UniProtKB/Swiss-Prot annotation:
This is U3 small nucleolar RNA-associated protein 5. Component of the ribosomal small subunit (SSU) processome. InterPro entries: SSU_processome_Utp12, U3_snoRNA-assoc_WDR, WD40/YVTN_repeat-like_dom_sf, WD40_repeat_dom_sf. One of its GO terms (biological process) is maturation of SSU-rRNA from tricistronic rRNA transcript (SSU-rRNA, 5.8S rRNA, LSU-rRNA). Residues 603-666 are annotated as: Disordered. It is found in: Nucleus, Nucleolus. Involved in nucleolar processing of pre-18S ribosomal RNA. Required for optimal pre-ribosomal RNA transcription by RNA polymerase I together with a subset of U3 proteins required for transcription (t-UTPs).
């Protein structure tokens, strides 16, 4: 038999009310969710049967998804979507904070259409039924458009006293019938662009709506749940069978009560036998409460009139017939589930997160109902190895979540100074002898050799690093970070548990901020960690906050790179010029140059005597200049014979004086 499953479609982001942006398709075989990455959101689609990731798509940085929904198959005749949009597979509709609507093809693995109408704000509900597309923004503005052409068919605003809306729900049985939700429920005829009925259902924002059509009664039933509310209000609306929707025909037929606040609803029923419907409510604590035949109240079942109003309310209120929860061991709190959806009226698919893994399980709830104890089924599911490690890591990481923006942490400096001063005072009070100092030095050398031998092995280094990260042992971390062997660092990081990568990066950021001069070694650790465990890091929740310290430090260092590079260029230029001069780069030119002046001892006195003899027109400066020429040049100019004789006598006197000095020295 064909089964219609109506899984809940999420409309709020996780930051708003704790509900993630998730959606099951109608068969509950495909599951989509949106996760936060470093700088952009990621759309991930899973095969819930195999429990594996099927496709992943990285959205543009400026696009922030606010709601998602799978394509629904209407029961009425309609035009189909072209294959260039759907890729002969199912499509996913995504609404953004900027008012855009994106169409993602699961078969093609890419965005095939983007619609921007310019009149919508933040999209809180978007649906596609064949070629008919529908969207509503947070202010209640509704747009109906053609998926194939993108043409707007109609647009209007739902009148409401509420400032914000929470979703839009389309009927697959009746064309142009929709329910818009805020604090109230507005039944809207999309063809006439006006609300048929408006109901005040809850005091808080509605988070889930499910509905079912009973052909025998010609009634349209729907159930409504809201945030911070344990009650699920049930309503019915009579139809006239002419294709029109009469007004003022909505009645309250009862309420379903859960033990905790309702997170989402899901309903399944057989088309050929719609009275065998079953409704599942997921509560905030992770418990699933099952309601069989939810529209059949005790008052209708007994067929009697209540004697009082309180008795009537009691008959209209129903509690769950079965509760299902997943736990680590008997009696433990339930595991918080992310979403649920009916695969059939007898089986339910649930999904929850374990660290970065998404876990799926199909629960044959009708078969397990015979094993219930006091109406409760506890399914024990132990943690995986990765999850158990993540739990320990999370505790260690939370103990050292100090934010480092830049510079040196003054707190650590004060601690270091206090320790140093305390040790100094203690040393002054009790100073060891020379023999004790020698013994201590010998022990320290032996310990250093043993530690270096241990650290040199990559396996031992990986073990030491894991232990240091789990116990937050600073001395062990320091011994690991002192290793600057690239091969050892790379092998150690490869053998490190991926769940410890965020903690390692945080510790490296602290070391880098405290000791910037160790950047050469620490950057090798950071680079190897990002390369080896980058695939795991992008799947870590709230990664931006966890790596904020590292990002701030690296950004601060990168901002100084251009100025330091310019300074390095100037220093290289100056140093190269100095080296060139020291190496005697101008020796060749120096050999060719003539001396500026030549000085002869006793020459000036003889020139004074010559000038006093009355040689007019010839100065001592001219004699010095003429002396700098060779004998050939002087003869060509008609040199003075008296001066030549005087020069010859001076040279003889000079040589005689020199020989006299040599003899005296001997």
């Amino acid at each position: 038999m064909a089964v219609r499953s109506r899984p809940q479609l999420a409309f709020q982001t996780e930051k708003e009310n704790g509900i993630g942006i998730t959606a099951f398709n109608e068969t509950a075989k495909l599951y989509a969710n949106v996760v936060e990455a470093l700088d952009a959101q990621r759309l991930r689609i899973f095969d819930s049967v195999a429990g594996s990731l099927k496709t992943e798509y990285i959205l543009e940085k400026e696009k922030v998804i606010s709601c998602i929904a799978w394509e629904q198959k209407p029961l009425y005749a309609s035009e189909q979507i072209t294959t260039d949009i759907s890729g002969s597979g199912e499509i996913l509709v995504l609404g953004t904070n900027s008012g855009e609507i994106l169409i993602y093809s699961e078969h093609l693995g890419s965005l095939t259409r983007t619609y921007s109408f310019g009149i919508l704000q933040k999209i809180i509900g978007a649906h596609v039924l064949a070629n008919d597309g529908f969207a509503i923004d947070i202010t209640g503005k509704v747009v109906c458009f053609s998926v194939n052409t993108g043409e707007v068919r109609t647009s209007f605003t739902v009148p409401s006293s509420s400032r914000e809306f929470s979703g839009l729900y389309l009927s697959t049985v009746f064309k142009n019938l929709a329910l818009a939700s805020s604090h109230n429920i507005h039944i809207v005829d999309l063809n006439h662009r006006n609300p048929i009925d408006s109901l005040t259902t809850h005091t808080s924002m509605i988070n889930s709506v499910v509905f079912q059509y009973l052909k025998d009664e010609n009634k349209f039933y729907f159930g409504v749940s809201a945030n911070q509310d344990r009650f699920i209000n049930l309503y019915s609306k009579e139809l006239d069978g002419t294709g029109e929707f009469p007004t003022n025909t909505v009645k309250n037929v009862g309420a379903l009560v859960c033990e905790n606040e309702v997170k989402m609803l899901s309903i399944a029923y057989e088309i050929e036998n719609p009275e065998t419907g079953v409704l599942a409510a997921l509560t905030n604590d992770g418990t699933i409460e099952m309601f069989e035949n939810p529209w059949l109240s005790k008052l209708r079942q007994n067929g009697t009139n209540a004697s009082s109003l309180s008795h009537r309310r009691k008959l209209l209120t129903s509690h769950s017939t079965l509760k299902i929860c997943f736990c680590r061991s008997r009696g433990d709190p339930p595991i918080v589930l992310e979403s649920i959806a009916f695969e059939s009226t007898d089986s339910l698919t649930v999904v929850w997160k374990e660290s970065t893994r998404t876990v799926f399980e199909t629960v044959p709830w009708r078969i397990l109902s015979s094993q219930a104890t006091n109406g409760l089924i506890e399914l024990v599911r132990s943690k995986t190895r990765l999850t158990s490690k993540n739990k320990t890591v999370s505790n260690v990481y939370d103990e050292s979540n100090a934010t480092i923006s830049s510079g040196v942490m003054q707190k650590d400096l004060r601690k270091t100074e206090e320790i140093g001063s305390a040790e100094a005072m203690e040393g002054e009070e009790q100073e060891p002898s020379l023999a004790e100092r020698l013994q201590n030095l010998t022990k320290l050398d032996q310990q250093a050799q043993a530690l270096s031998t241990q650290i040199s092995a990559s396996t031992s280094l990986s073990t030491v690093l894991t232990q240091a990260l789990k116990t937050n042992d600073q001395s062990l971390l320091e011994s690991c970070f002192n290793n600057n062997n690239v091969e050892t660092i790379d092998t150690t990081i490869r053998r490190l548990d991926p769940s410890l990568a965020p903690i390692l990066l945080d510790k490296l950021a602290e070391k880098l901020a405290l000791r910037p001069m160790r950047a050469d070694v620490l950057m090798v650790w950071i680079r190897c960690t990002l390369i080896t465990h980058g695939g795991h890091l992008v799947l870590v929740d709230d990664l931006k906050h966890k790596l904020a310290n590292l990002h701030s430090i690296l950004e601060d260092r990168a901002s100084k790179y251009s100025s330091m590079l310019a300074l390095q260029g100037k220093l290289d230029l100056v140093l190269s010029q100095i080296a060139f001069r020291k190496a005697g780069g101008s020796k060749d030119n120096a050999e060719d140059e003539e001396p500026i002046s030549i000085y002869y001892e006793g020459y000036e006195e003889s020139m004074d005597e010559a000038s006093s003899t009355g040689d007019e027109g010839y100065s001592s400066d001219d004699s010095v200049d003429n002396e700098m020429y060779s004998d050939e040049e002087n003869s060509s100019k008609g040199a003075f014979p008296d001066e030549e004789n005087e020069n010859r006598e001076l040279s003889e006197d000079y040589s005689g004086d020199e020989s006299l000095e040599n003899s005296e020295s001997e």
